[in-house]
């Protein structure tokens, strides 16, 4: 079964996120558990935690259908020790918030070497950052998102994702989230079913589908291989509809949150309905 949704706002309280997801016909959702552009946040109160859990139950969202995202400020591969510690502390806080909320996944961007350390050293720092957080939490999987490779961001090649996983001690609590826009911008073609087959065969060989814990379904304004991260609505960008139809009809993408981060929230309900319809089309074929 496919879990399909979008990254919804938690404005006004975390308990509003499940309601907003239900309003657009979603069977999955992503959210920030705190302001994504600030380092610090007030601790979660028992009331906030209870309200969120009650709302998830009310709208039938289990932890497997929810993909929280961490702060954009965090860089787990930071070349400067003091800044690295700040990121590690913030990441641990994000993991602990998920733990408190009963969530089992935390999606994050791996990090950037900022042109100051070697790529291999940065990847090792990211893996060690994950190890530090996993050692102090329970039940939450660290889900590494592939990047477009913009600037000095790492995680744009499957080999880089595999290298990070290789450095994580508890393999049962690390996974990846594949963003289709990022993959396309990084040079992984998705424009035809044949291209999708090839790209995901490569993913399966290098990373492994056992580590796939979520996806971001985004078309791309950016050109193929451009290393530029610019999302678009489904079918309106340079990837086109075929990739998303193909994903909906492949059982390897069952049971994980498939999250829209497309540019027009006003049509998320339509995009979710279209994605669901592709599943039905396959079932009837």
Curated annotation (Swiss-Prot):
SUPFAM superfamilies: Xylose isomerase-like. It comes from the Bacteria. InterPro entries: AP_endonuc_2, AP_endonuc_F2_Zn_BS, Xyl_isomerase-like_sf, Xyl_isomerase-like_TIM-brl. Its EC number is 3.1.21.2. This is Probable endonuclease 4. Disulfide bonds: none annotated. The keyword Nuclease applies. Binds 3 Zn(2+) ions. One of its GO terms (molecular function) is DNA-(apurinic or apyrimidinic site) endonuclease activity. PROSITE patterns: AP_NUCLEASE_F2_1, AP_NUCLEASE_F2_2, AP_NUCLEASE_F2_3, AP_NUCLEASE_F2_4. It is an enzyme of class 3 (hydrolase). Gene3D superfamilies: Divalent-metal-dependent TIM barrel enzymes (3.20.20.150). The gene is nfo. Keywords: DNA damage, DNA repair, Endonuclease, Hydrolase, Metal-binding, Nuclease, Zinc. Zn(2+) 2 binds at residues 145, 179, 216, 261. It catalyses: Endonucleolytic cleavage to 5'-phosphooligonucleotide end-products.
């Amino acid at each position: 079964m496919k879990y399909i949704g979008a990254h919804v706002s938690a404005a006004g309280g975390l308990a509003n996120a499940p309601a907003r997801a239900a309003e657009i016909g979603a069977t999955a959702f992503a959210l920030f558990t705190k302001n994504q552009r600030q380092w610090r946040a007030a601790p979660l109160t028992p009331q906030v935690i209870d309200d969120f859990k009650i709302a998830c139950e009310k709208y039938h969202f289990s932890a497997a259908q929810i993909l929280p995202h961490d702060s954009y400020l965090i860089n787990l591969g930071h070349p400067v020790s003091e800044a690295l510690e700040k990121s590690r502390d913030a990441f641990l806080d994000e993991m602990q918030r998920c733990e408190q909320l009963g969530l089992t996944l935390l999606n994050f961007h791996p990090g950037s070497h900022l042109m100051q350390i070697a790529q291999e050293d940065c990847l090792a720092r990211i893996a060690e950052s994950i190890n530090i957080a996993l050692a102090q939490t329970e039940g939450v999987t660290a889900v590494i998102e592939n990047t477009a490779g913009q600037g000095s961001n790492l995680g744009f090649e499957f080999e880089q994702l595999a290298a990070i996983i290789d450095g994580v001690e508890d393999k049962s609590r690390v996974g990846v989230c594949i963003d289709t826009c990022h993959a396309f911008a990084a040079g992984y073609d998705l424009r035809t079913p044949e291209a999708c087959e090839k790209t995901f065969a490569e993913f399966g060989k290098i990373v492994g589908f056992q580590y796939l814990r979520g996806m971001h379904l985004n078309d791309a304004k950016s050109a193929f291989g451009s290393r530029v991260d610019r999302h678009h609505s489904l079918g309106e960008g340079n990837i086109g509809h075929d990739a998303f139809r193909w994903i909906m009809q492949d059982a390897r993408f069952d049971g994980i949150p498939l999250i829209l981060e497309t540019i027009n929230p006003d049509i998320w309900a339509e995009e979710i309905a279209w994605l669901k319809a592709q599943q039905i089309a396959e079932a009837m074929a």
